[in-house]
Every structure is written in structure tokens, then in C-alpha cells.
Amino acid sequence: MSYPQEVNKRRTFAIISHPDAGKTTITEKVLLYGNAIQTAGSVKGKGSSAHAKSDWMEMEKQRGISITTSVMQFPYNNCLVNLLDTPGHEDFSEDTYRTLTAVDSCLMVIDSAKGVEERTIKLIEVTRLRDTPILTFMNKLDRDIRDPMELLDEVESVLKIRCAPITWPIGCGKLFKGVYHIAKDETYLYQSGQGSTIQEVRIVKGLSSPELDAAVGDDLANQLREELELVQGASNEFDHEAFINGELTPVFFGTALGNFGVDHFLDGLTEWAPKPQARQTDVRTVESSEEKFSGFVFKIQANMDPKHRDRVAFMRVVSGKYEKGMKLKHVRIGKDVVISDALTFMAGDRAHAEEAYAGDIIGLHNHGTIQIGDTFTQGEVMKFTGIPNFAPELFRRIRLKDPLKQKQLLKGLVQLSEEGAVQVFRPLMNNDLIVGAVGVLQFDVVVSRLKTEYNVEAIYEAVNVATARWVECGDAKKFEEFKRKNEQNLALDGGDNLTYIAPTMVNLNLAQERYPDINFFKTREH
């Protein structure tokens, strides 16, 4: 197959949702359709051996939530789909934000009983930075749900994106009978209890068919016909250009747990979602059709293999083709490296990559030299932009139970900060170590990983820090004066960048007023 054909058949997407909307279950079912797994392990079985294939760190297994971003590749409809699983829980936004920089489209999963929730709103804001196309799956139709028209109205008003329903539900909860495909004029009938395998779905042709009344009952059939008249009058038709520009979302209804409706949005994804897109660098735009290799690192994961204490850098291929043993330039450090052992992923199972094309995600073994945001090329000096660090909102001081392990603690924290699990700050005035996170659960993750991966037992204490900003100044003399007078509020982060740590927002505002020549940044490009 030629290079353009390889690139054109790729679809790289992430699933975004509020915690517990069913994202991990959908991930499972998608893999089932892609023949990547044989039976879907029910995610609810926390104590059973059938853990969801994409949740594989120790703590995730105990809690049943996806903490790390894993990558899964599978074939579907003559396309090669790369699915980036993103942490769904409240507290993992920073990793999730960065993962959204590495995809070309997103699937938004909504719990149909609850509608649009807070985390979904935040994540959609991040996709807006790049106008990422969004598909929508209204989940949990096997439970009692809100009125479908209401759900569409809420998405449109809260998320400011037009909805184009592709399928429409027939009943819900115990009365859920299936969905009607508007464009194809076909009804797909639902059978409960078939969730862990791909079921043969009975299809009824035509909305006016008596077979439809016989299958779902007169009441539901008539209700469907009435609702569809309303829908076709009140909602938008699918418009591909508006979808590509992130202005309109095709909406599918179904139940991930019952494995029903998942294939409909997969068909939509492979047919409508964009092939690998162009990316900005600090010098030019790189097109996916270019044959020279380039890519950027958006995540670093420690110890994916419990048997090996290694770290893997996840790289999005932007252009060209990776081939085993090729020489690439690691732009930030100006060094050429031979990559002979890149990995491809199937959540927890790793395989050595012989080749990878634009749109694919590969893993590079990292012995401490690769950082988030690093660019690799076939010689060209450029840096991909738009992979930010976000100022933490929560802070704790971290302390050792055994003071002799200070060196291991620092090493563990710096490694965890490089992979984006947490941010570390070392105040200039004392030997404290302060950990900053975007959500509470990250603190638990850090303590548990320090224990299992670095054999360090640590505990947290409260610390008088409310917020942090990265500080820079073009005038060296003024910067020195600022540093001299504010030493008690300054710290170095894991990458040795100077940071202002403020005990209160009032303190930060005063500092910004007092030093107008100093730039205080809420995000920092990697």
C-alpha cells in the first residue's frame, strides 16, 4: 500500500466524558468490534479477574477507573483506528488535556440519565483550542433516561455545538427496544443480556412497516413516528464540513454495557472523521502527507511493564513513516538517536513496531532524556507547539517516613513530574518538597507509585500554597531584583523552571501589581 493510502486510512481519536458515564465500557466494546479482544470483561467486576483491558495500573485495578492514558490500535471498516483512552476521573485533567493534543477527533460519551456534566464541559473547552471534530454517543439507554430532545437541546445550549441525530431511540430502561437510523430508514432491534459479545441484530426496513409495530408494539412504534416528525423539523441535518470544523456533532444513541449502538458511531467515525491532520511548529506547518518523519511526545508513562523499571514516551507521528532502526533527531537536545525498539500498544500488551505512519502512536524507551513536548524529526530543526503544562490548583508538602531515602524520593518525584503525573516544586529557601496537582486523586496515585515503584514510603502535610505561576522577565536586572526580594515565594519545578508560589490569591495579585515587568504564566509550553 502506498504512503498516502496508509495515512488516509488512519483515524486517531480519544473518548471524553464525565466520570462514570461509561467511557471504559465503550472502550471495551470498541475493541471487541475491532477484534482486539474476544469477550469484553465486565468493568463492574472489580473483584473478578476480568478487568477492563484498558485499565492496567495496580491502583486502577482496585478502583475501577482509568488513571493512565493507554493507546489501542485496531482495524475497522478498512481503516486503522487508534484509540487513546483518557483518564475519566475528576482528577486527571492535565493528562487528559494533553492527550487531546494528540488526536484528530473525539467521541463524547454522555450518560443519558444525567445529560451534560461538568468534566465534559471542561474537556470540550480543550478540544476547542484546535476545533477538534466531535461525535456524540448518548449512553445507558437500558436505564431510564431524560427526554432525548431535551438532551440534544442541552448539548447545543451548554456546549455551543449543533446536534445532528443519526439514530433515534425507541423506548428506554426495561422498555428499550432499539434505535432507528434516520438516513438509512432502518430500525435495529435490541436484545438484552448480550453485552459481552457482538450480537446479530435484527433489522426492520422502513418506518411505516407493520413489522416494526409487531416488533416493538403499537404504542412505541407510533411514539417513534411522532418523535421523528418533531426531530426532523427541529434538529439539524448532518453537515460534513460543519462537523470537520467542530461546529456540529453527529449524535448516536445506545447502551455500551448492552453492546448496542457502538458499531453505529464506529461507522460514523471511519466514514466522517478526518484522516491525520497537519500540525503547527515554531517555524512552519507540517502536513501529514509529507514523507519525512516528524512527531511529538505528549505523554510519558513510567513502569508500563512491572517486570521492567522502564519509562515509555508516547509519540504522535505527525508525518512520514517510522521504520525500525531509523535515525531521528531529538531536537531539544540536538542529538541524533537510532530508534530500533519502538513499541505499538494494545493496552497493557506491548509489541515492537516494525513501522508506523502519520496518525499512529508509538512508544519510545526513555531513560530520562525525553520530556513531554519533545519533537523528533529526520534532521529538521523545529518544535511542535500547543502541548501545555497547566498551573496546579492543589498543593501538599510531601515528607518521608524514613529520612534516609531523600535521594530516592527526589528521583521518583522528578520522574513522575516528567511524565505529567504531578508537578514538583522545590522552594529556594528550604529543603521542602511541594507537590502540585490538578485533582486530589493524583496525590494518592503519587504516594502509591512511590511505594510500589521506588520503595519509598511518603506522607503528605498541609502547606500554605494556594496557587503557582511560572515567572519570566526580559530585563535581567529587574528579574534579579524580583528574585532577591521574593525569595521566600520562589521555587524550582521539576524542570528547574522558576515558579512563584503564592500563599493566597491576594498575595499573587499584589505581586503582579508590584512587578509589572515580570510575566506570571498560568500555562507553560513544554
UniProtKB/Swiss-Prot annotation:
Record key words, sorted: Cytoplasm, GTP-binding, Nucleotide-binding, Protein biosynthesis
Keyword field contains rRNA-binding: no
Transmembrane segments: none
GO CC term, one of those recorded: cytosol
Entry keyword annotation includes Nucleotide-binding: yes
Molecular function GO labels: GTP binding; GTPase activity; guanosine tetraphosphate binding; translation release factor activity, codon nonspecific; translation release factor activity, codon specific
Binding, GTP: 17-24, 85-89, 139-142
Highest taxon of the lineage: Bacteria
Pfam families assigned: EF-G_D2, GTP_EFTU, RF3_C
Biological process annotations from GO: regulation of translational termination
Record-annotated tr-type G domain positions: 8-277
Locations listed in the record: Cytoplasm
Biological role: Increases the formation of ribosomal termination complexes and stimulates activities of RF-1 and RF-2. It binds guanine nucleotides and has strong preference for UGA stop codons. It may interact directly with the ribosome. The stimulation of RF-1 and RF-2 is significantly reduced by GTP and GDP, but not by GMP.
PANTHER family: PEPTIDE CHAIN RELEASE FACTOR RF3
Family: Belongs to the TRAFAC class translation factor GTPase superfamily. Classic translation factor GTPase family. PrfC subfamily.
HAMAP family found in the cross-reference section: Rel_fac_3
Protein name: Peptide chain release factor 3
